[in-house]
A protein has these predicted regions:
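Predominantly a core beta-strand signature of beta-propeller blades
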Residues: 5-8, 17, 60-63, 99, ...
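Beta-strand-rich domains and repeat architectures in extracellular enzymes and scaffolds
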Residues: 5-55, 70-84
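A flexible loop/linker signature enriched in serine peptidases of the S9 family
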Residues: 41-51, 71-77, 92-100, 114-120, ...
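Short loop/turn segments that connect beta-strands within beta-propeller blades
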Residues: 56-59, 104-107, 154-158, 205-209, ...
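Generic structural signal for coil-to-beta-strand starts
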Residues: 36, 89-90, 130-131, 181, ...
């Protein structure tokens, strides 16, 4: 074997970048649809592309997202929930154009939102009304700060979406009750970050998808709330740091009720 002497740091190493990232894939957002489990999987061997994967009860996994798509949203720049699924129908944000696409089971994705500078995320599907409630971020006016709103998006005919909640700087986490009659969401304003202070709002969902009786039910400038979720019986649960620790709470007629008082953080 011939030995070659080269300056320090200039030799050809057997440890390549491809070798380092080959097994560094990661799993993200997880959703349930009946007995099926869906999740986002980052594929380093495919240029760090994100795809939706489905696992059925028999243990079989299937890549749902076609090759030319990358499931990722740029809402809030940090990103967020980038897909939703109901009855086998997957709605997702594509990273390249930030449009929302609908993909029926076994079918190809078709765009629902127009080719304008709008971003969507945190979607939840309402099959009874054929809507998806989600965050929309409007970047269509150059030089203006992006406008965040909660919108309903027609999952059959598409469009830009109908604005349901607006006026604050940021919105996130729309959550639809199991019976489809109520919607909860989070909102906050500059200069706060969501880990500083957020407001939890709820509203009744009318038959046409519009909202009524919207009201703030918890939170504030010094109370960071996240992960609002409805139980099957219509109770709203959420995490709040009003004690200095992110603990679990339940919304009652008398306001938030502390479920577990611990010097510990709770989150999914």
């Amino acid at each position: 074997m011939i030995m070659t002497t080269t300056p320090y740091g200039s030799w050809k190493s057997p440890i390549t970048t491809d070798l380092i990232v080959a097994d560094s894939g990661s799993l993200g957002q997880i959703e349930l649809d009946g007995d099926d489990i869906y999740w986002v999987e980052m594929r380093p061997q495919e240029g760090a592309r994100n795809i939706v994967v489905r696992r059925t009860p028999d243990g079989m996994t299937t890549d749902i997202t076609p090759t030319l798509f990358n499931v990722r949203t740029r809402v809030h720049e940090y990103g967020g929930a980038c897909f939703a699924v109901s009855d086998g129908v997957v709605m997702f944000s594509n990273f390249a154009d930030q449009r929302v696409y609908r993909q029926d089971s076994g079918g190809e994705p078709r765009p629902l939102t127009p080719e304008v500078d709008l971003r969507y995320g945190d979607g939840v599907i309402d099959r009874r009304r054929n809507l998806m409630f989600c965050v929309r971020e409007d970047h269509t006016v150059e030089g203006r700060e992006a406008v965040n709103t909660i919108v309903s998006l027609d999952i059959e005919n598409g469009g830009e979406g109908t604005v349901l909640a607006s006026g604050n700087d940021f919105y996130s986490s729309p959550a639809l009750s199991v019976d489809g009659t109520k919607l909860a969401w989070l909102t906050w304003n500059h200069p706060h970050m969501p880990w500083d202070g957020t407001e939890l709002w709820t509203a009744e969902v009318n038959d046409d998808g519009s909202l009524g009786n919207a009201q703030m039910v918890a939170g504030g400038d010094e109370d960071s709330i996240f992960q609002p979720e409805w139980s099957p019986d219509g109770t709203l649960y959420f995490v709040s740091d009003r004690t200095g620790w992110w603990n679990l709470y339940r919304l009652t007629e008398d306001g938030p009720k502390h479920l577990v008082a611990m010097d510990a953080e709770f989150a999914a």
